[in-house]
Amino acid sequence: MQKLLLITGIILCVSISTTAQKSRVISANNLLESENYQEAKEAIDLAVINTKTANWPRTYLVKGLLCQNAFEAGFEKEDEKKTKLYPDQLYLAYDSYEKALELDAKKRIHASVETQYYELANSFQKLGQRHYLRREYNQALKAFELALLVSRSPLISVKVDTSLIYNTAMAAYESRSWDKAVQYLTGLDKDSYSPETSLLLQKAYMAVGDSISGELVLNDGVGKYDYNQTIVLQLVDHYVASGRWEEAFVLMDSAIVHQPDNYYFPWTRGLLYQNLEQYELAIEDLQQASKLAPEEVPIFYNLGICYYNMGVEIDKKALQIRSNKVYRATRAEAKKSFEKAVVWFEKAYEANPGDQPTILKLYQLYSRLDMTEKRDSMKQFIR
């Protein structure tokens, strides 16, 4: 009987001791509800290291609540007394909740964690946005990925907002985390999120040395986004950089058919012809572009360059001609090209009188054509 009383006493003492320790967790919860975060921290930190409560799910639930609630209370005003109770406080909130779920075999607190996860995902998004705006891209990526992780938790299983995936992709891109950038941008590109995602995905592939996949993305984007101008021009640049001129022209021909009112396309094809010194074809396209965009001054300059270069080529041919009659006729032909160049350069100068390349070309042409008065007036503007 005495032995039984002894055992009962021991059990009672253990029970009282355990209850006392658990009351510390309850006290911490009460303190955080009254926004006494520092005192709540002291109480919960003791509970975490006490053997009686170290494996109690509610201990970690309360720690998660403390970390999250204090962080959210201080976030807008950047109150570090609230947001830095612990290092990486919001991440510790998530880890604490996950620990609580792991210990909660009977799932008694799952509903409580579920309630917190909706707001926790939102808090990670806000944290990521703050880091991103401050160009702290690695930290932004970390926060956005946690927002995704929480949003995809089986506890809440909400449909992830594509804007969150986009933000995560952008943080990965800006932080030069290329593999992750490819991962997130690929998902967006499959959903036809925007032309920008195709362009960024192509650049991410190029950054990891996968030019084949990058080219496929742009090719797909041309059709997907109805010959989006930026995608088309990026693909043309890719073809030209790899010496695939024929494919560049095929693409531009198709783009002009699909978007006949887009002056960038004949302008670009004209520049391709100009680069290959096929000046007559270049002039034809550039004039068409100028009709579509009569205020686009750089086209005037490009037309001037074509006529100028044609004149130079004809002049070179004249030097090889022995017949005086043919020589004079060839020089006259060159002069006509130079005079046409003057017309376009003067239009460019009239629209943008401070442009040095235009001023220099006019000075050269006035000199070549013996237009002394105009040459002298232009000389003063050369810097």
Regions inferred by a protein language model and the residue ranges of each:
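Canonical tetratricopeptide repeat
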Residues: 62, 116, 126, 160-161, ...
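TPR alpha-solenoid repeat register
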Residues: 57-59, 110, 156-157, 164, ...
